[in-house]
Amino acid sequence: MKQAIGHDYYIFYKPFGVISQFTPEVSGQACLKDWLNLKSDVYPVGRLDLDSEGLLLLSNDKALQRAVLLPENKMIKTYWLQVEGHFGQIAAHQLMEGVYISVQK
């Protein structure tokens, strides 16, 4: 990736049990600040769930953040997963067809 003047880019392998933000939601919760000492204008580009681990991109490049995160940009993302228990052909077929995840707060 070509670095624009004044922009910083970092990659971090987020461990299981660490929240993908710099401040904890509850006292004692592990967060990025426990692992990284970056400028205050650097933020994760996306997120990984608390109970997942993987590569996390961080930057202060707002154009990059918009390009990756805005749904209308249709950025293709690939995830690898590990499942516990039985994972049959029906479940595999459903995942290959695509799964709609409804988010309600």
Labelled PLM ranges:
Residues 1-105:
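RNA pseudouridine synthases
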